[in-house]
Amino acid sequence: MDNINFTPKDILQKEFKPKMRGYDPADVDTFLDSVIKDYENFGKEIERMKNENDRLTDKVDELNKQVSAGGTVEESAPVSGATNVDVLKRLSNLERRVFGAQLEDTDNSSHRI
């Protein structure tokens, strides 16, 4: 909403310069063109937010369905526990490879001294 030209206060306090036969039509038209652009931008922003709201509402509904189906997932929790153990073993092996190589490099450099 960075491209909004006027606040409601700006519109309320706008003063047009009177001419011999009333206000300058070009001044009024210029102001109204800016107001129209603001309204168009507001409309686009509202439409974008509605679409985002619909998308997020659908996502919440989808996640709620997954959570409500969670009762069957909880019954299979031991399988998840085994999977977690497997992940921890893999992580431990990876750490040994990475940090073990660093330790070997440190030991080799200290033997050179």
UniProtKB/Swiss-Prot annotation:
Pfam families: DivIVA (PF05103). Transmembrane segments: none annotated. Its main location: cytoplasm. GO terms for biological process: cell division; regulation of cell shape. The keyword Transferase does not apply. GO terms for cellular component: cytoplasm. It comes from the Bacteria. The keyword Coiled coil applies. NCBIfam families: DivI1A_domain, PRK14127.1. Forms polymers through the coiled coil domains. Interacts with PBP1, MreC and EzrA. Divisome component that associates with the complex late in its assembly, after the Z-ring is formed, and is dependent on DivIC and PBP2B for its recruitment to the divisome. Together with EzrA, is a key component of the system that regulates PBP1 localization during cell cycle progression. Its main role could be the removal of PBP1 from the cell pole after pole maturation is completed. Also contributes to the recruitment of PBP1 to the division complex. Not essential for septum formation. This is Cell cycle protein GpsB. The lineage of its organism: Bacteria, Bacillati, Bacillota, Bacilli, Lactobacillales. The gene is gpsB.
